[in-house]
């Protein structure tokens, strides 16, 4: 087998988002768009979390939704997208020129996600598809994702079970005098991974990803960070306001603050002790 053929190989353990789930989400999107923006013609989804919600895969590209159809355009990786997503229409793209050539015409108003879209991305889209104005649909997308299906709730329950086991049952046994903040955080994170956590927490913020979370001892938990949350940490250093210090050791009588994220197949639970 040549090295190029490895691009389409994926583990047998892959669990795809059911096609029926994707179809329901797309139908709800069109229904809400017609309510809020009657006569809409085209929406372009670029944010990877929203792309995953509607397609079941996270790639570099764009999901174009119209009243009559939806196409996932993928620059990289097309093979992976075809393997992961059950969406029927997935096509390769080189740039937005590919979309412009395919659609030929475009509406005066384009519906996009303004919260995560960069000016550079909007300019590139407009270069090849010169619409007159764009309208933000972040609020609409958030309102759709707020209402969880039974499929989504089941994944959150699985995440919560991992959270409960690790933070309530294992953490008390792992907290011992002399352990560092960083060591405790990494150890708890590792236990979550062993039990099926997907290993990252995503939040609807400009810098919205955290991997390991935070373990803080004593007054370290009062050190404010840029993250909009109740806890704090000195971090590993000034440049990384997360995880905890590898040099701050637990002493007898100090309070322990833990905020270690957990999630399963894209769905999170939040637990702090």
PLM feature spans:
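Terminal domain-start leader segments
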Residues: 1-71, 107, 150, 168, ...
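Flexible, acidic/His-enriched mid-domain "rim/lid" segments that flank
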Residues: 2-10, 101-223, 250
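Short, basic, glycine/proline-bearing loop/turn elements
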Residues: 9-19, 82-88, 230-234
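Acidic/histidine-enriched ion/cofactor-binding microenvironments in catalytic or ligand-binding pockets
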Residues: 66, 104-105, 214-266
């Amino acid at each position: 087998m040549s090295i190029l053929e490895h691009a389409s190989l994926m583990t047998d353990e892959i669990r795809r988002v059911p096609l029926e789930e994707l179809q329901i989400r797309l139908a709800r999107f069109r229904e809400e768009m017609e309510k809020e923006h009657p006569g809409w013609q085209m929406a372009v989804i670029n944010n990877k979390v929203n792309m995953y919600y509607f397609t079941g895969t996270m790639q570099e590209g764009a999901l174009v939704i119209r009243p009559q159809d939806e196409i996932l355009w993928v620059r990289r990786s097309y093979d992976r997208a075809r393997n992961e997503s059950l969406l029927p229409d997935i096509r390769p793209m080189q740039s937005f020129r590919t979309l412009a050539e395919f659609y030929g015409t475009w509406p005066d108003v384009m519906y996009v996600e303004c919260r995560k879209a960069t000016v550079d991305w909007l300019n590139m889209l407009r270069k090849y598809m010169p619409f007159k104005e764009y309208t933000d649909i972040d609020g609409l997308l958030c309102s759709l994702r707020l209402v969880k299906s039974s499929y989504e709730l089941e994944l959150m329950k699985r995440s919560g079970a991992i959270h409960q086991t690790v933070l309530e049952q294992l953490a008390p046994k792992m907290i011992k005098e002399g352990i560092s903040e960083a060591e405790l955080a990494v150890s708890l994170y590792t236990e979550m991974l062993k039990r099926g956590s997907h290993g990252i927490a995503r939040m609807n913020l400009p810098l919205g990803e955290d991997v390991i979370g935070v373990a803080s001892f004593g007054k370290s938990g009062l050190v404010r960070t840029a993250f909009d949350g109740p806890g704090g940490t000195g971090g590993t250093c000034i440049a990384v306001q997360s995880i905890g210090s590898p040099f701050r050791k637990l002493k007898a009588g100090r309070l322990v603050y833990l905020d270690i994220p957990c999630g399963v197949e894209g769905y999170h639970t939040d637990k702090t002790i």
